[in-house]
């Protein structure tokens, strides 16, 4: 667990907390002084040296190594891309849909996941969506659809709309028992608790820096299990995917033997500089401590919400950093929060409140004060005791 002193020290690194309560990390992490300094270092190198590509390449590889350590992978298993979409597209382009055609994914996926796999229908993919049961998708529902025709199971760890955490372990075991691959989109969870991709038995893992990794947009990381790399030949590619990008050979493709084969063009160097501080901060705090701190806050909020009879879209037993409440007018409720300098977000009828290392119990109490004053903008909980949508 983080100490009060540690949390205060973390908050002091983010200027926004001088004037606001920030509960929107599910959309974008706030800017820290360390990230700003990283960007200034990049600008200084550009000013002073013009094109110091050797220096920038060192930073690029340092980011790869730092993220690999963060998820307990090897640097050779990590690709650096400009977005989760770019990484997923690269993998999708490398798959062969002739023998196994099915792609099984839940209807809670972020749109980019659905769009990319639906686009593979042109290459023979049979895309099937697992229906939700209320605000959950049980592993048993995946089991009914995954079979020997299934090529890959793309899976979101935490749903962006309701905060539901998927039954990752069970779904992975079901998929692998049928010979299917598993891809985890961890954008809404990475940076909030420990990640060990080997222990999780994942084939692919993708996330980005702009949310709980406390970095900028425009940078994402993708893990590819080492045993798969050489067998996958992406058709979405570019010069930085080559074994030697600086061979400048336009007439031959010679892909890198590492996960770098899933990269595209020139790297987003400013974002690399800005990505490192967040990963470093979280690593220094210890991810077990970070997870315990977040869990304490989300459980406190859910307890208050249930006591008031407010309907939570987020199942209490699967809550991660994101708690979503059912609102009858989420746009108006957001404005009410903004009037009190509380930054949150909404998706359709859901008010999203996201917690991280810099949030406190005082933040929870401040939000609850606004919710109590505007309880008419929140849907009542179902009559069944302890139930959630």
Residue ranges of predicted features:
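Pyridoxal 5′-phosphate
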Residues: 1-389
